Amino acid sequence: MQIQAIELAHFRNYRGLQVDFMPGVNIFVGANGQGKTNLLESIALLSGGGSHRDARDAEMVQWQEAYYRIKAMGTADGQPVVIELAFGGERRKLAKVNNRRLRRIADLSETMNTVVFSPEDLSLVKGSPAQRRRYLDRELSQASPAYGDVLSRYARVLTQRNSLLRRLREGSATAAELELWDDQLAPLAVETLARRLDGLARIAPYARQIYRGLSRDKEQIELTYRSSFPLPDDRSRWLEAYRKALQERRAEEIARQATLTGPHRDDLQLFLNGRDARIYGSQGQQRSIALSLKLAEIAFIHQIKKEYPIVLLDDVMSELDPDRRQQLLSELESKNIQVFITTTHLHAFSPEQLGRAGIYRIQAGQLSRSNE
């Protein structure tokens, strides 16, 4: 899908906004704190994956207002599409596509997909395992809402099991109760793990190919999945292996009041020329790997959905050196991908790039089209 126009009501610092967009590159320029990222966030929400800033819906409602509403008009497969997302009031949160209410907010990803690239993504390599798990989970959830459902159910059962572990330590629960939660957790853990590994097997070739191009065939990367428990070669034995791992660490889990084995403890390992990129990669190499992962995300979604996602570059251009900026924009423009970029200045763009882009000045939630 490509967005032709968007309307906001009571979203963050936008009381009301209506703006038309270009089919290619759109640049939002302004000082920090004026609403550039808020506008990108509103677009990201329309793909059903939640806020890329991990914000709660109530935090996105304008101060002293009761609701927010986002409406986008665009085209998909040559047909007009209208997406609406609202939060607040009696129904709390609802989503519509062409005036048809969706059963789940996550179903928005069937109509529109987005890939967000922010400065935090540049630390994907050296960051925490949780950051790399989020990268993988958000990507797979957009490609398949069913994966998002499995992940949500796993998280809910995990929370309940951790609560029971605390009660076990206090003496107010029994081992039999824990077995019941293990029965629910284990199949969800194994399904989450299987879907992650299958997804990674499709993403990794793109990342390897893209990184080879960025390094001009001088270096290569490998992506591997590190499970928190030993995985048998035979997938039919994974459930048994996971239950065994839970049993072996039960005393430790009760003592620490937390589940210590499962997909929530796994990691995506990144290797550069056979060595751990987190330890041995330079900052430039780590950023190139992060860039490769995000571009691989775009290619993966295109493979699944047969169309490119909308790309949101949130204050990331100033964090890249000129070569990587040029490589990124050239890659996106060559595929006719619709791109939204936030920046505090236009120095990072060539006159030719600015001439092709839609440029919008943002100040205190007010937006105006610029001719620069």
Swiss-Prot record:
<keyword id="KW-0238">DNA-binding</keyword>
<keyword id="KW-0227">DNA damage</keyword>
<dbReference type="InterPro" id="IPR003395">
    <property type="entry name" value="RecF/RecN/SMC_N"/>
</dbReference>
<keyword id="KW-0547">Nucleotide-binding</keyword>
<dbReference type="GO" id="GO:0003697">
    <property type="term" value="F:single-stranded DNA binding"/>
</dbReference>
<dbReference type="Pfam" id="PF02463">
    <property type="entry name" value="SMC_N"/>
</dbReference>
<keyword id="KW-0235">DNA replication</keyword>
<dbReference type="GO" id="GO:0005524">
    <property type="term" value="F:ATP binding"/>
</dbReference>
<dbReference type="GO" id="GO:0005737">
    <property type="term" value="C:cytoplasm"/>
</dbReference>
<dbReference type="GO" id="GO:0000731">
    <property type="term" value="P:DNA synthesis involved in DNA repair"/>
</dbReference>
<keyword id="KW-0234">DNA repair</keyword>
<comment type="function">
    <text>The RecF protein is involved in DNA metabolism; it is required for DNA replication and normal SOS inducibility. RecF binds preferentially to single-stranded, linear DNA. It also seems to bind ATP.</text>
</comment>
<dbReference type="GO" id="GO:0006302">
    <property type="term" value="P:double-strand break repair"/>
</dbReference>
<keyword id="KW-0742">SOS response</keyword>
<protein>
    <recommendedName>
        <fullName>DNA replication and repair protein RecF</fullName>
    </recommendedName>
</protein>
<dbReference type="InterPro" id="IPR001238">
    <property type="entry name" value="DNA-binding_RecF"/>
</dbReference>
<dbReference type="InterPro" id="IPR018078">
    <property type="entry name" value="DNA-binding_RecF_CS"/>
</dbReference>
<keyword id="KW-0963">Cytoplasm</keyword>
<feature type="binding site">
    <location>
        <begin position="30"/>
        <end position="37"/>
    </location>
    <ligand>
        <name>ATP</name>
    </ligand>
</feature>
<dbReference type="GO" id="GO:0009432">
    <property type="term" value="P:SOS response"/>
</dbReference>
<dbReference type="InterPro" id="IPR042174">
    <property type="entry name" value="RecF_2"/>
</dbReference>
<dbReference type="GO" id="GO:0006260">
    <property type="term" value="P:DNA replication"/>
</dbReference>
<comment type="similarity">
    <text>Belongs to the RecF family.</text>
</comment>
<dbReference type="InterPro" id="IPR027417">
    <property type="entry name" value="P-loop_NTPase"/>
</dbReference>
<keyword id="KW-0067">ATP-binding</keyword>
